[in-house]
Amino acid sequence: MRVATRLRKNAAVMSVRRREWLVRLSLIVVSLLLFLVVGEIAARILISRQNGGKEGKEQARYTEYDPLLGWRKRKMASATYKRREYTVEVKTNSQGLRDPERSLEPPPQTFRILALGDSFVEGYTVDLKDTVTKRLESRLNDSGCAAEVINGGTAGYSTDQEYLFYRSDGARYRPSLVLLFFFWNDVIYLDRQDYFGTPKPAFEMGDAQVKLHRYPVKEKPKEASSSEDEKPEPVEGSALLAMIRERLWLGAPDVHDALARLGLWNPIPKSSPRLEMLVYDQRDLAPVEDAWEKAEAILKSLKQDVEDHGSTLALVYIPGKMEVQEASWKATRQLYRLKDGAWNLDKVRQKVERLTSTLHIPLIDLNPALKAAEQPFRSTYLMFDGHWNARGHDEAASAVFDWLKTSKSLPEVCGGTLPLQARSAQVFDPALQTREP
């Protein structure tokens, strides 16, 4: 009797516990399903609000054809970049710079720097106040050194166009110091006559010298513009899964492919690198080496021209995202199925080091500073865009500011050895092949 009673009690307890576990399991399942449903809805809302578009679409709204440079920013123009990671309005001043209004003549007792570069310097991924030039200017002024850092950057430019911009426009501002920001994709376009279909200037080599080969640059036929913002294509399947996959692809490619092997999604598809990326190839490829030869000649000419004006030239090396982030390098290797040793991540930087050493151009390498600044969930680069975010611009400005102090590349009133401004403001007239005041 006692045994039977005990068995009935144990059975009742087990039944209660079983029901409790079933209730708990049901709550877990319902919570998980609710989480997935809410996550899916949120993912679809986020994707629907993402802005698509191409760089050229916005750029066409504030640039114009230029017979020397191929294109330049229009005066007093504006356009808004709408991207998944940023929405930024770009405005130009009365001189066609993405900058505050600047007089051609430097203000009294003011140190003037001119920054030459491409989209990293123009900085269309961040507000004007957050660009590398404005952050550097703020640091100088906050330190007690009255300064102006002029933003001479234009998206899509390579070193040849930056050189020509200095000769035709930049020298007018009498900068004491000229900072040339150099990025890996500048190299190959030095030996090309168009940039993604848009004609650009071309130089020809002769006796290690460069000569402008084509003036005026051909004008690209105008395309019909659309005022509507381009939207991303609708997601097929789960939007939440697509968002997770996309972020793992770029941020944790090993995890992405591990889950792909389990059948959750397809592995990273194989692609072929564009010619411009072969500057990292371990082999010395002829088209790349020809472009490097032209880069050396253009840098030599720019240095001579800057010094003829009584200014100093320094080169600022911008590392590619994959040079700074291990995850980006892994994703690149998987995308192109690169074998070990096929590419050398240090090759571009090493080439730049040799060039600047040979030409006696001071080098500011941003690689160490940007690597040191990288933190989990606090990157210096945008995840999808590949340019700097506001933090990246600020870290770059900080590194340049530190170099200015340690190298004494400041005017005497700020503890350095440079003049406040250039001796000459003469510019180049390509139509006459002469200089004019």
Model features per residue range: what roles?
Residues R17-R19, W184-R354, T358-I361, L366-E374, ...:
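Serine-dependent acyl-ester chemistry module
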Residues E40, D118, E162, V178, ...:
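Generic structural signal for small/hydrophobic residues in well-ordered secondary structure
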Residues L27, L382-S424:
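Histidine-centered active-site loop/cap adjacent to the catalytic His
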Residues Q50-R139, S143, N266-S272, V348-V352, ...:
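Membrane/wall-proximal cationic-aromatic binding patches
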